[in-house]
Amino acid sequence: MTNIRKTHPLLKILNNSLVDLPAPSSLTSWWNFGSLLGICLAVQILTGLFLAMHYTSDTATAFNSVTHICRDVNYGWILRYLHANGASMFFICLYLHVGRGLYYGSYTYTETWNVGILLLFAVMATAFMGYVLPWGQMSFWGATVITNLLSAIPYIGTDLVQWIWGGFSVDKATLTRFFAFHFLLPFIIAALVMVHLLFLHETGSNNPTGIPSNLDMIPFHPYYTIKDILGLLIMLTALSTLVLFSPDLLGDPDNYMPANPLNTPPHIKPEWYFLFAYAILRSIPNKLGGVLALVLSILVLAIVPMLHTSKQQSMIFRPLSQCLFWLLVADLLALTWIGGQPVEHPYVIIGQAASILYFSIILIFMPLIGTMENHLLKW
């Protein structure tokens, strides 16, 4: 008798993606983050759905509705903090996933990589709009500052900003549309995830060595399902510890004050996961230049496959490239720190130096070192 999972039209697709999928035998824990991101997305959609049942997207009641969720709704507090800190977990996994792709040369699978960049932009847009919804001080001023950046676009900038705002300032219309898009985007992200996986399964997964592993494959289940479950347990432990012991650790205290258009907070800053891009934005004294640098800080990933000069795919056998990669990681951590500091000396100059280094490593040093290592291989 044939197995139903191999014959049923729907189960067959799941079987070929999750059970009988041939996977390289040498995958490390760095390959866990794809499944963790899928679980993060599911958690965010579920908690978000229940939060949306009690939230009101009106400037007069939005702040109070979030308070109501935390105080009066059964387990509303845990839903709210799972959703808020789940976003932080999402970005931790995202950045580690992208870092893994850079280190092991997974960007050579250009279709998968480009869909991944689209996903990154979509998740960032969703997180930004979600941060506006509680309608606290930082929500309001963050929305004002970031949307106002679009006014730097020549000719159409001002009209575009007013069109997004639905008026002459961030107000009721803005909040309502942000809620609508914040609700819609995760489902678009889920569809893009399917496309991401479709392209991945066309080529098969990369592995730490960067050497084709067609001769040494093992079934995804049980080997990698059990490995993914371990990763899931570690992530859930970290998330639940954060939610239950210090749920406001990563938030901004200013967001516990209702939005007041007449009172600007002393330091307007986004959530921690956007600070590196915010630091790059602030390090350029020109408004349009800053906006371009902000977009390019993520979009630069799209040209990484074109700049791959090395004869080896992975960095595992390339010590010079490894040094450069970890310098990039340190630089991003420095940018994250600078993004949270006030705009004053010495933070400004450190931010500018770190921004220049960020683009230099990716656009200049990585390709140069790759070429150099090719020559060293001939010796």
Swiss-Prot record:
GO cellular component, one term: respiratory chain complex III
Membrane topology: Multi-pass membrane protein
GO molecular function: metal ion binding; ubiquinol-cytochrome-c reductase activity
Self-association and partners: The cytochrome bc1 complex contains 11 subunits: 3 respiratory subunits (MT-CYB, CYC1 and UQCRFS1), 2 core proteins (UQCRC1 and UQCRC2) and 6 low-molecular weight proteins (UQCRH/QCR6, UQCRB/QCR7, UQCRQ/QCR8, UQCR10/QCR9, UQCR11/QCR10 and a cleavage product of UQCRFS1). This cytochrome bc1 complex then forms a dimer.
Protein origin, superkingdom: Eukaryota
Function of the protein: Component of the ubiquinol-cytochrome c reductase complex (complex III or cytochrome b-c1 complex) that is part of the mitochondrial respiratory chain. The b-c1 complex mediates electron transfer from ubiquinol to cytochrome c. Contributes to the generation of a proton gradient across the mitochondrial membrane that is then used for ATP synthesis.
Positions of heme b b566 binding: 97, 196
Chief subcellular location: mitochondrion
PROSITE patterns: CYTB_CTER (PS51003), CYTB_NTER (PS51002)
Keyword Phosphoprotein listed: no
Lineage: Eukaryota, Metazoa, Chordata, Craniata, Vertebrata
Binding site for a ubiquinone: 201
Protein name (Swiss-Prot/TrEMBL): Cytochrome b
GO biological process, one term: mitochondrial electron transport, ubiquinol to cytochrome c
Transmembrane segments: 33-53, 77-98, 113-133, 178-198, 226-246, 288-308, 320-340, 347-367
Gene this protein is translated from: MT-CYB
Cross-referenced InterPro entries: Cyt_b/b6_C, Cyt_b/b6_C_sf, Cyt_b/b6_N, Cytb/b6-like_sf, Cytochrome_b, Cytochrome_b_C_euk/bac, Cytochrome_b_N_euk/bac, Di-haem_cyt_TM
Residues holding heme b b562: 83, 182
Co-factor note (free text): Binds 2 heme b groups non-covalently.
Keyword annotations: Electron transport, Heme, Iron, Membrane, Metal-binding, Mitochondrion, Mitochondrion inner membrane, Respiratory chain, Transmembrane, Transmembrane helix, Transport, Ubiquinone
